[in-house]
């Protein structure tokens, strides 16, 4: 987000990423664009208001990868009283200013499918609106926009160190080949997520005033538990909530956990206790209990939260903190915390802080310019795609549209039949789209394609996934 905003203001930008773009925390969220209903209990009113306002912006500028979703909260005896939930939802409806989504309401769960999949003892609840986003696609589309505005993007490139001298940084970076290079810059923005303190130490030094608290969040994916389009937000007896979200047509996404951790490297996968926690929290409400054998996939991310001294990981603020320091006249901005919903506002705040050190050709602009592929009218754009490619299955066209929006026609070109799309890898992934990911979205491995640029891996057998991996191992075949 910062690279896109800065490049669009005429700043010369080089972005260094040690792995794949979105390969860590950015693609491991619960994939919600939301104010955060539970943050009202922590009196984070400014954060909630800002996030709700941003929800409106993102639904407009990323309309093909973000869409409204209705959330149902069953009333659970012995947990939050009805008056508290109603008061919170009333505030949630109004604190973000003008909104386009339907407001909250009380619901009878047996009516209109609102309680589909739930145990019959849950008879009443509440419904409200938020939104869902494909987080990994959001990363890639921001980078496509940044690149179009002139940013130099360097994936699989490690930041080694930087020294400040006479108002400029000399940064050493290491490419995947092992070759090292030195680049110069007036400012250094440290948006390394869980590695923010590591990068700070390799540059001007760690901040004495701010530090990161690492919190592990894991999710599981199970076969879809109900056919309705709404998600569930379920209260747990530890006062946390978990989400059950329709996911990739055939599945339900369940998350998240909050576990304080000391090491990033030891926290890359879900552990058994987290799996059992999520299943137990869901099974309290479900008519058909889930078992560990139902889990078809899981993923884990480490959140780099600003350490505000909270003992409970769930109570640590999700707001962002920007720490600006100068070394021999060169500026270093370290970024702590933040959530995906407010990434664009964080970028604006970062550029505001850096304004004394940089020259901008224009002011804030990312609220007004759509991300690549975002249509102004999603329904009309999808209908136009169907009409243009009548021989291709609509389910395939719709999946492509949800990833690429109006760029789908550019991807397909003159390929009007399935045969023209090249090899069928299964899971709705064809050779033509795979090449698009490689040539236009910096994909270099099977994981980049199957689990981030798309989620085709969920719909494929292990044998088919291995075929994609083999293709990348024989990289000349997709070069």
What are these regions (language model features)?
Residues 7, 52, 147:
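Anion (oxyanion) recognition and catalysis
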């Amino acid at each position: 987000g910062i690279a896109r905003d800065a490049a669009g203001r005429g700043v010369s930008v080089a972005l260094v990423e040690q792995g794949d773009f979105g390969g860590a925390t950015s693609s491991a969220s619960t994939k919600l664009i939301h104010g955060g209903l539970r943050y009202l209990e922590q009196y984070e009113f400014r954060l909630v208001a800002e996030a709700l306002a941003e929800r409106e912006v993102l639904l407009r500028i990323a309309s093909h990868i973000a869409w409204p979703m209705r959330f149902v909260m069953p009333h659970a005896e012995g947990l939050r009283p009805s008056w508290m939930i109603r008061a919170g939802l009333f505030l949630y409806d109004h604190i973000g200013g003008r909104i386009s989504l339907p407001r909250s309401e009380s619901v009878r769960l047996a009516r209109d499918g609102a309680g589909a999949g739930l145990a019959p003892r849950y008879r009443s609840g509440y419904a409200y609106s938020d939104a869902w986003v494909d987080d990994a696609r959001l990363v890639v589309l921001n980078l496509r926009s940044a690149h179009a505005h002139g940013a130099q993007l360097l994936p699989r490139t490690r930041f080694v160190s930087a020294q400040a001298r006479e108002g400029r940084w000399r940064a050493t970076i290491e490419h995947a080949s092992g070759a090292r290079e030195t680049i110069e810059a007036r400012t250094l923005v440290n948006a390394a997520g869980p590695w923010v303190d590591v990068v700070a130490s390799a540059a001007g030094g760690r901040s004495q005033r701010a530090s990161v608290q690492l919190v592990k969040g894991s999710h599981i994916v199970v076969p879809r538990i109900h056919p309705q389009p709404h998600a569930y937000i379920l209260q747990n007896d530890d006062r946390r909530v978990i989400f059950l979200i329709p996911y990739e047509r055939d599945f339900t996404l369940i998350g998240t956990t909050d576990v304080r951790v000391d090491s990033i490297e030891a926290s890359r996968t879900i552990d058994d206790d987290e799996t059992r926690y999520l299943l137990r929290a869901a099974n309290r409400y479900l008519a058909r209990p889930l078992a560990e054998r139902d889990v078809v996939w899981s993923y884990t991310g480490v959140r780099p939260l600003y350490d505000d001294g909270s003992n409970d990981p769930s109570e640590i603020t999700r707001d962002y903190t920007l720490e600006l320091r100068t070394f021999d006249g060169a500026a270093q901005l370290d970024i702590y915390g933040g959530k995906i919903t407010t990434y664009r506002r964080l970028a604006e705040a970062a550029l505001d802080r850096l304004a004394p050190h940089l020259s901008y050709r224009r002011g804030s602009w990312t609220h007004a310019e759509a991300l690549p592929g975002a249509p102004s009218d999603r329904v009309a754009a999808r209908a136009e795609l169907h009409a243009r490619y009548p021989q291709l299955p609509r389910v395939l066209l719709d999946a492509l549209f949800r990833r690429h929006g109006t760029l789908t026609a550019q991807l397909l070109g003159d390929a009007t039949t399935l045969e023209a799309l090249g090899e069928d890898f299964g899971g709705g992934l064809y050779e033509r789209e795979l090449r698009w990911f490689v040539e236009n979205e910096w994909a270099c491995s099977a994981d980049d394609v199957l689990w981030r640029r798309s989620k085709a891996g969920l719909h494929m057998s292990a044998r088919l996934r291995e075929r994609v991996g083999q293709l990348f191992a024989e990289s000349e075949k997709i070069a």
